[in-house]
Amino acid sequence: MSKKKGVGSSRNGRDSESKRLGVKRFDGQFVKAGSILVRQRGTKFMPGLNVGRGGDDTLFSKIDGYVKFERKGKNKKAVSVYTEEQFESVAN
């Protein structure tokens, strides 16, 4: 019989870094062209007017303007960016 206890190492202690996904700019907020609006996996939010979609599904603004979250159909959401004049007419 052995006189020493076998000491094993724990198999825990690993975790992946968070990906910092989510909405970065909110409804009514002013953004500059190229600003990241939403970081996502898949298309939870669709690109709307003046919004582009990157290779990793990130949504970004194509123009300087104001962010507007809208419904697209029954169960999809879209993010658009409007100029100040457009935003005032859409908001009312």
Curated annotation (Swiss-Prot):
Biased composition (Basic and acidic residues): 12-21
Any one GO molecular-function label of the UniProt entry: structural constituent of ribosome
Matches recorded under InterPro entries: Ribosomal_bL27 (IPR001684), Ribosomal_bL27_CS (IPR018261)
Keyword line: Ribonucleoprotein, Ribosomal protein
GO CC annotations, alphabetized: cytosolic large ribosomal subunit
Record-level GO BP terms: translation
The organism's place on the tree of life at top rank: Bacteria
Region Disordered, residue ranges: 1-21
Signal peptide: none
SUPFAM superfamilies: Ribosomal L27 protein-like (SSF110324)
Entry similarity comment: Belongs to the bacterial ribosomal protein bL27 family.
Annotated HAMAP family: Ribosomal_bL27 (MF_00539)
Protein name listed in UniProt: Large ribosomal subunit protein bL27
Species lineage: Bacteria, Bacillati, Bacillota, Clostridia, Halanaerobiales
Gene (UniProt): rpmA
